[in-house]
Amino acid sequence: TDSAFAVARVEDHIINNNVDFVIIEFAMNDQWLAGETRCRTYEGVLRKIMNNTDTAVMALFVNERKEPFPGMQHEQQPICEYYHIPFVSWKDCVLKTGSKADFENYFDGTETVHPNTAGHGSIASFIIEKLEEKKKNLPADKKIPAPVKTLPAAMTDTGFEFAKYYHKDNIKPISNTGWKEGTPRHDDWIKRGNVREGWQTAEVGAEITFEVEGSTIGVTYCESDQFRNALAWVTYPDGTDSEKVPLQCFQMSRSGYYGWAYRELVKGDKVQKYTVHVQCSKRAPKSQAGKPCNITGILAAGKTK
């Protein structure tokens, strides 16, 4: 997923499992996350882990196949440096030890985003190298300083550090004209802990509403060629409505597998109560006819700096 959807997952998949070590990689998928959201959610994931666990954290920056090897390293590396989080840049490591042409061996066919087995092996080798370097340079046990428990002020804001994820198990709609509980689940997430589900409907124009509290409000949803698009918006405390935001649940390119997306509905600097509306699109092309739309949950950011 991208780092916004990771905010919704981090409690179940990392914090509640009391893991010893985690590698954070969103340099690839955050390319398709809205610019005003990327750094805030990436920093939010890091702060959630560092403030709620003793988990050791390393960052990984993966890139696309073709030059200039796109990825979000240029945005994420400064955040890691700010928090003294060690990182591995696949692109930098390959170009330092080999050549640009090496990346042609790390992807199959016309694939440009997902590395093949050799590509994953290359990434793993650089992670191992970084860990061995850190281990080699460790001081004697008695000279290892106590870990710092107080984080510095946030670079962006603290909203996503204190985000709450609403789903079918912890919130009920205040109105509903045709949505039912239940959404797709990722097999890997099932293996690692709880999988939160939301709501879906194939009824054209069906609307579901919720009352939530937060500074920034967004919705998460599942993408594939088996869905129909939806619309989402909020009613502000003064009774006015925000603009309607399209939820692109239908993605022709995702055939046989799911994508996981986040769309922000409102961004604020203080916690307020909002009414969230989601509506199954009334108009859709034939390719979406009869298919359901969905939301897997609502992500409500909390405090800000």
Where are these regions (language model features)?
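Short beta->alpha junction loops
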Residues: T1-D2
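Alpha-helical cap/lid subdomain in secreted, periplasmic
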Residues: F5-A140, R192, G198-A206, E211-G214, ...
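Catalytic cores of secreted or luminal carbohydrate-active enzymes
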Residues: G121-V195
